Amino acid sequence: ELKRHLLDQHSHLYCPLADGLSYLPNGIELVGASTQPLWHASLWVADDLLIMQKLDGQYCLTAASLCSPSSWHLAQKIGHSMARIHDPVPSLHQKLTPKIDRFFDHLMVEKPIQRFNWSLQANTNLAQFPEDKIIHPASTALYYRCERQTLTRLPQTNAIAFTIRVYVYPMMSLTQVPDALTQLKAAIDAMPKAVASYKEIIYFAPALQKYFSD
């Protein structure tokens, strides 16, 4: 399915190989073993690929190819339920996890869902890990991290494919987007303290003032 989609919709970028695809801009051959289909597919797209399946009444993360985590380790999440995975997120486990499971139950094959998430970081690295956390001085340059996430029900297995594509922008670039900094400040000001702490807003606050005061 993915191979056919890339060849149909992005034929200017890909051409077929017997066991994979060739990426035309640089000639790289993207091949993989048929016994590892998720790894095979992950070579073809920039998105991280995660698979969730319903086990014993709960959706669990059962497989993944992850290159750009947002302050978490795959080894600590794989095999666990959504409730366990989201436990560190303030208010989410208690209030939203049951709703997330119900939402997944109603996800239809022909209607994939797209959503976006954001955070701040102190460098351009796509991969962010919990141990990278530091207190950021006011002079530190900031970057806006945006995740484009999709959820798709797979027709044959009924599992859910969760994709994450990460983009990182210098905070200064938001000045070119009308009202972007104003809306970001409003979102931060309205954020519960626990969520602001989880997103490390407290550490970025001195540096943020430079952008919000201009």
Where in this protein do the model-derived segments appear?
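Extended, well-ordered protein cores
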Residues: 1-214
